[in-house]
Amino acid sequence: MPALLGIPALIRFIMGLVPIAIGYFAKFLGMIITRNGLMASALIGAILSVVSFSIQLLGDALSSSMGGISADFGNLMSSVLPDGTTTCITVIITTRIAVFVFDIKDRLLGIANKVI
């Protein structure tokens, strides 16, 4: 009979423990998602800014070096290349950069998990 008297106390204990465990798990999962998201965003932003800066420098260098070339060369290039070439190349390069960044992020997190 004394064993049956402890069942309501055990149920109340479990009912108090379950929300705490769920809250702890949700907080832990939120921290992991936030950390990974922030790391990925920072890496993507840094790499895209470096790539855009280098493309800008390359474009400036080419435009200054090709100052003596006539407009016929530009007309030739516009007639050879399709309409959406620059957009297509930009999307492909951005996708490759995003895949590279997520690969780097996974490697960094793997190293961090081995250390910790």
Curated annotation (Swiss-Prot):
Domain of life of the organism encoding this protein: Viruses
GO cellular component, one term: virion component
Main subcellular location: virion
Membrane topology qualifier: Multi-pass membrane protein
One GO process term, biological-process aspect: symbiont entry into host cell
Alphabetized Pfam families for the sequence: DUF5455
Location within or outside the cell: Virion; Host membrane
Transmembrane spans: 13-33, 38-58, 84-104
InterPro entries: DUF5455
Entry keyword Translocase: no
Keywords annotated in UniProt: Host membrane, Membrane, Transmembrane, Transmembrane helix, Viral penetration into host cytoplasm, Viral penetration into host cytoplasm via pilus retraction, Virion, Virus entry into host cell
Subunit structure: Interacts with G3P; this interaction is required for proper integration of G3P and G6P into the virion.
Family the entry assigns: Belongs to the inovirus G6P protein family.
Function: Plays essential roles both in the entry of the viral genome into the bacterial host and in budding process. The formation of the G3P-G6P complex termed adsorption complex is essential for correct termination of filamentous phage assembly.
Official protein name in the record: Head virion protein G6P
Organism: Salmonella phage IKe
